[in-house]
Amino acid sequence: MQYSEIMVRYGELSTKGKNRMRFINQLKRNMKHVLSIYPEVSIRADRDRAHIYLNGANYVPVAESLKQIFGIQAFSPSYKVEKSVPALEKAVQAIMVELHHEGLTFKISSKRSDHQFELDSRELNQVLGSAVFAVLPDIKAQMNHPNVNLKVEIREEAAYLSYENIKGAGGLPVGTAGKGMLMLSGGIDSPVAGYLALKRGVNIEAVHFASPPYTSPGALKKAQDLTRKLTKFGGNIQFIEVPFTEIQEEIKAKAPEAYLMTLTRRFMMRIADRIREERSGLVIINGESLGQVASQTLESMQAINAVTTTPVIRPVVTMDKLEIIDIAEKIDTFAISIQPFEDCCTIFAPDRPKTNPKIKNVEQYEARLDIEGLVARAVAGINITEITPQEESQDEVDVLIEDLL
């Protein structure tokens, strides 16, 4: 027997009252985006649950994709069966024979939405249970906590059988909490920050600062591949490439080395905020972890944050590096993050960066720079690409790495 559909149960959105259908419709859109790589699949989202119709698609990869989508509490693959007692008996017998092992206990749980069916739920439980005993006379029925709870649903068009309950990603559907601009480097931390923001329903757009020729095409592709990894949790993501070469060269030429990182990060924050404003975002998200590097002391964060009044969310701020790496490995971004491409945060990194920058000094050094002109030119030069849930090319990555060696 081959699975015909997957029944999806919603997560936290079940508590959202009058906004429930808005959350469900957003989840449906997200599922469509993520599952778009399976053209046979179709989706119906009702108030109590959603149905993923496989239409011949391979269940295994579809299920793996569903496990990643935020807003799903659990799901169950189902078999579609002719709506007749003989067909149901045959199907139930086939399933239980396949699952059977010594000591296995089972239960039949029937439910009818088609009340014209010839048997009520209790009668159907008895008939199908007897069918199981006919082929497995030694099997034991158990009403509380059986090994297998075989669910039978009688609908208008057919009957559906399921016994698995697979845990989903939980959280909220991406897009239900508004839009945020993720400051995405090529490192380990910022993709994890993006993942955690997605889990709480934030629709992220990835802002990546590129400084060619100091940063390579490989560094850009690395950031795009990290973004692609994040699409599996809620669908397409806008990737915003910011030209940052002029700004870094100006800072390098006109500011003391110890303040390079602080000034660079302040420009990044200004640009991310300008893009947020133009693209109707609500927050800025970054991967700062307290005390991990010089620019992530409380004093540095305060100096960098001073250029904006926009809320800055730091999902990994209290995590240590090993905790962040654990999540990066779980979401499959770690191997990409450690590819040997430098990003714009590392190319001009000072040997002894200021860990306690004074705002007065920072503003004095910035007075040497055309802040508004530099920011405006960077924002005017952005390049936006929509990243979709497609497979990244490992061959292309290997070629780019070879070019560095």
Swiss-Prot record:
GO terms for cellular component: cytosol. This is Probable tRNA sulfurtransferase. The keyword Transferase applies. ATP binds at residues 183-184, 208-209, 265, 287, 296. PANTHER family: TRNA SULFURTRANSFERASE (PTHR43209:SF1). It comes from Streptococcus mutans serotype c (strain ATCC 700610 / UA159). Belongs to the ThiI family. Pathway: Cofactor biosynthesis; thiamine diphosphate biosynthesis. Its EC number is 2.8.1.4. It is found in: Cytoplasm. InterPro entries: Rossmann-like_a/b/a_fold, ThiI_AANH, ThiI_fer, ThiI_N, THUMP_dom, THUMP_ThiI, tRNA_STrfase, tRNA_sulfurtransferase_ThiI. It comes from the Bacteria. Gene3D superfamilies: 3.30.2130.30, HUPs. PROSITE patterns: THUMP (PS51165). Pfam families: ThiI, ThiI_fer, THUMP. GO terms for molecular function: ATP binding; CCA tRNA nucleotidyltransferase activity; tRNA binding; tRNA-uracil-4 sulfurtransferase activity. Catalyzes the ATP-dependent transfer of a sulfur to tRNA to produce 4-thiouridine in position 8 of tRNAs, which functions as a near-UV photosensor. Also catalyzes the transfer of sulfur to the sulfur carrier protein ThiS, forming ThiS-thiocarboxylate. This is a step in the synthesis of thiazole, in the thiamine biosynthesis pathway. The sulfur is donated as persulfide by IscS. GO terms for biological process: thiamine biosynthetic process; thiamine diphosphate biosynthetic process; thiazole biosynthetic process; tRNA 4-thiouridine biosynthesis. Residues 60-165 form the THUMP domain. Keywords: ATP-binding, Cytoplasm, Nucleotide-binding, RNA-binding, Thiamine biosynthesis, Transferase, tRNA-binding.
